[in-house]
Amino acid sequence: MKRLLLLGGIGEALALARRLGPAHLYSLAGLGKVPGDLACRVRVGGYGGAEGLAAFIDEQGFDLLVDATHPYAARISQNAVRAARLAGVPCWALRRPGWQAGPGDDWREVADWRELIAALAPFRRPLFTLGREPLEHLGQVPPHQHWTGRCLQGQPAAPRAEVIGARGPFSLDGERALFERLACDVLVSKNSGSQATEPKLQVAREMGLPVLVLARPALPPADREFADGEALLAAIRDWESA
């Protein structure tokens, strides 16, 4: 029986895992809730880099590695491609396209945190929706700014900064209420992409707020790449039956 290792981290990965049988393994880094209703096995934790992942693939006898991690998890994707090559198995990847700005959107892409800090200079109350990443930069908050960040787990208050613990998905009304309560004047976001644009981007459009978009990292090419989960699942079904 063929066996695959699915590296998860986004909603589409969980949707795939729900449709996998007990021969397969769904792997999570450890952030967030672990689903308890899956037919496939679940593993939580890292592997110690590409070499460790390759050894795990070889020891467990997996025939296929599927990378369905977040588009900004560049290191994991790099390790996945390298590990598959070391283990001698194919690596398939879910590479969902990014969101596209539409009428009324004011999106401004920045390449890295240096550009982001510079682009934030005219604003006073930015809202960061970058996960835990802003926590590493709280020492850079200028005197005229107050930062609010949102991630899975809240953090103790810092000078001129607040970190809210919240788990999505978020409703449109909830995002409107949050933006109004915070009186934010700019949104900082990743271009994560998905089938639907997130409510926070719609609220920014409604309120006429600019969105500073942290550019996607370059990802290594996989043996096969898929733009959506359904196409990936269809390929897995074909692979299982071949």
Model-derived features: positions:
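A C-terminal functional module that forms or caps the active site or interfaces directly
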Residues: 160-186, 191-207, 212-216
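N-terminal beta-loop-helix "entrance" segment that forms/cooperates
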Residues: 26-48, 105, 158-163
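Histidine/lysine/aspartate-rich catalytic loop segments that bind and position anionic ligands
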Residues: 139-169
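N-terminal basic/disordered segments at the start of proteins
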Residues: 4-31
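Short acidic-hydrophobic, aromatic-tinged amphipathic segments that line or gate anion-handling sites
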Residues: 42-46, 106-114, 224-232
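Glycine-rich, highly charged phosphate/nucleotide-binding loops
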Residues: 40-57, 164-174
